């Protein structure tokens, strides 16, 4: 058996240890890739699916025409809609509820809506203390729509070429 000088040199000089230490030092002095979350927030995609919202037209009228397509397409059966006819013959929603504990954020409701009434907005920070707060009624959904309308409209415009 012959003496392997190269292998012995690597072993005695702890070459693997030196390579590992160098790699660790390189990552130690490099900029950190993580964000300090509550204080720093990363960019969101225009296609991000967050908290649900009902939108209104610019004149203030509700967009929802009570076609119930979103209710029919929801795989989790999280949406409940009741409607009544208006004087002019069109329909109006009297009840629009979403059970956020059932919702799987698939976006089918948004895709099925012919008038872009129900959308999933940019808000992802809506933790609650009780389960009942995750049952969204029509007023809560309309308030979300009013709060996030500018960003929702911008995101829908950016996403329009892909729809």
Swiss-Prot record:
This is NADH-quinone oxidoreductase subunit I. GO terms for cellular component: plasma membrane. InterPro entries: 4Fe4S_Fe-S-bd, 4Fe4S_Fe_S_CS, NADH_quinone_OxRdtase_chainI. Pfam families: Fer4_7 (PF12838). Residues 54-84, 94-123 form the 4Fe-4S ferredoxin-type domain. Its main location: membrane. Belongs to the complex I 23 kDa subunit family. [4Fe-4S] cluster 1 binds at residues 64, 67, 70, 113. Coiled coil: none annotated. One of its GO terms (biological process) is aerobic respiration. It comes from the Bacteria. NDH-1 shuttles electrons from NADH, via FMN and iron-sulfur (Fe-S) centers, to quinones in the respiratory chain. The immediate electron acceptor for the enzyme in this species is believed to be ubiquinone. Couples the redox reaction to proton translocation (for every two electrons transferred, four hydrogen ions are translocated across the cytoplasmic membrane), and thus conserves the redox energy in a proton gradient. One of its GO terms (molecular function) is NADH:ubiquinone reductase (non-electrogenic) activity. Its cofactor is [4Fe-4S] cluster. NDH-1 is composed of at least 14 different subunits, Nqo1 to Nqo14. The complex has a L-shaped structure, with the hydrophobic arm (subunits Nqo7, Nqo8, Nqo10 to Nqo14) embedded in the inner membrane and the hydrophilic peripheral arm (subunits Nqo1 to Nqo6, Nqo9) protruding into the bacterial cytoplasm. The hydrophilic domain contains all the redox centers. NADH-quinone oxidoreductase forms a supercomplex with ubiquinol-cytochrome c reductase complex (complex III or cytochrome b-c1 complex) and cytochrome c oxidase (complex IV), which stabilizes the NADH-quinone oxidoreductase complex. Its EC number is 7.1.1.-. It comes from Paracoccus denitrificans (strain Pd 1222). It catalyses: a quinone + NADH + 5 H(+)(in) = a quinol + NAD(+) + 4 H(+)(out). Binds 2 [4Fe-4S] clusters per subunit. Gene3D superfamilies: 3.30.70.3270. It is a peripheral membrane protein. It is found in: Cell inner membrane. Keywords: 4Fe-4S, Cell inner membrane, Cell membrane, Iron, Iron-sulfur, Membrane, Metal-binding, NAD, Quinone, Repeat, Translocase, Ubiquinone. [4Fe-4S] cluster 2 binds at residues 74, 103, 106, 109.
